[in-house]
Regions:
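Nucleotide-activated chemistry modules centered on ATP-dependent adenylation/adenylyltransferase
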Residues: 3-6, 15-54, 59-223
Length: 223
């Protein structure tokens, strides 16, 4: 299990050195430009329908997208299926021509609890969160490699509460191991989060009030 210290705007490596934050929006712009109009296959890990609204609106202009909904951290089980159904409904509403695909990831909460064992009391943005993201990224990268996708990425960076540097560095490391590319991104840029709220309201998407796991739910209720 890797141990990395990270805050909202920076990351410390295992030697305690602060890594300079990169502008991942500029990196994404450059990657899209280098495609020269070619529509590469992208497997998009979606954490939830609301966060995917803007990301789908944005990236569907440049990529052939399949959404992969794999979030075994969601609690309780009924909540998981509610979020899955909202994701499906959003895709069907935004893309009635079926131009965006969908893969329904298995609800396997045992894998999540095993991944965060011993870290249950740590809060959002902690090592517990890192292990949760790593679990989901590994499964996404595996599916992407098996499915012949050129890239994978996630909707997670759209949240103002998620550290884009941690997400991108982790994604790149995992992608390399599976022989594919990670699409660097920071979807909160260009008013992405604001746009996601507008689109969620437009499509009447259910917006949950906690990240997903039982620990984040309890932390939210305490606040």
């Amino acid at each position: 299990m890797s141990r990395i210290s990270f805050g909202k705007d920076n990351v410390q490596d295992t030697k305690g050195k602060i890594k300079m934050k990169k502008n991942y929006q500029l990196i994404l712009d450059s990657e899209i430009s280098n495609l020269n109009g070619r529509r590469a296959k992208l497997l998009l890990h979606s954490c939830c329908a609301p966060c995917s609204t803007y990301v789908l609106e944005y990236l569907s202009r440049f990529f052939d997208i399949t959404v992969f909904y794999y979030n075994p951290n969601i609690y309780p089980k009924d909540e998981f299926f509610m979020r899955v159904n909202e994701q499906k409904r959003l895709i069907e509403t935004m893309f009635p021509d079926s131009s965006v695909g969908f893969i329904d990831g298995k609800y396997d909460d045992d894998r999540f609890y095993e991944a965060v064992k011993g870290l249950e009391k740590l809060g959002e943005g902690s090592q517990r969160w890192y292990e949760c993201v790593e679990l989901r990224f590994k499964e996404t990268a595996k599916r992407a490699a098996e499915g012949g996708f050129e890239y994978f990425t996630t909707t997670l960076s759209i949240s103002p509460h998620k550290n884009s540097q941690v997400l991108n560095e982790l994604g790149a490391d995992i992608a390399e191991k599976y022989g594919i590319k990670y699409l660097f991104s920071d979807f909160k840029k260009k008013n992405g989060y604001k746009r996601s709220c507008e689109l969620s309201a437009q499509f009447r998407i259910y917006r949950q009030n906690y990240c997903g796991c039982v620990f984040s739910k309890n932390e939210r209720e305490i606040k």
